[in-house]
Amino acid sequence: MAAAWGLKTLVIDLDPQASATVSIGVDISNCKTTIYDVIVDGATIQDSLVSTSVKGLDLVPASLELAKAELRLSQLDEPDTAMRKACEAIRESYDAIFFDCPPSLGVLTSNALVAAESVVIPVQCEYLALEGLSALVQAIDVVRHGRNPDLEIAGIVLTMTDFRSNLAREVAEEVKRFFPGKVFETAIPRNIRVAESPSFGKPVCVYEPHSTGAMAYQLLAEEVAKRLLDKGGLEAVRVPSGAVEGPTP
């Protein structure tokens, strides 16, 4: 969405499952250099950049080798600073840089937290997700009191929601009660277009821009941009509010 607004955008995929890489339509087998080579072997981000089919969007792809990165990084004196050091050379080249993290609190996620300015936390509307949320918030506090005192939680987004379910409503209320003012108004619903867009190698906002899921991501992006603007974390964003109309399933 940031790229659609004319922002030069970079996605860095830190998930060994490479979900972001695949979803954007990049074939990992064609990538000679990945984020593993950057944070473990000292390659530069410039060496691993991949242009995507989305105008203004670049990617640093993940690879299955990332599963070994935790062990390699843990042997370093400062295992959680590799990503921040690698980003120093390219920060001024992009308007927005996003880290896609694995669903665990290991060294890869720590590297992203040390390098980032803000965190957007996705939470599925399931009870087990609440424990993971609490652990992540505690990890963010540790990083904030250590290597990255400027790190902030931009907000929490409820995902895969179906508010016809009592469970989904109860979990949403619980998250809002424990984290007042942090939960975005926009929730991402369960939507077939969101689920199938990765198989076509396109973000849902490109694959089916008028779908309910794409509309939700558009509204969420506007909320995130507004919060970052209010905090001074984004110098200028021209958000075409309401540019997409007429949602379809």
Q: What does each of the following model-derived ranges do?
A:
Residues 1-249:
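P-loop NTP-binding core
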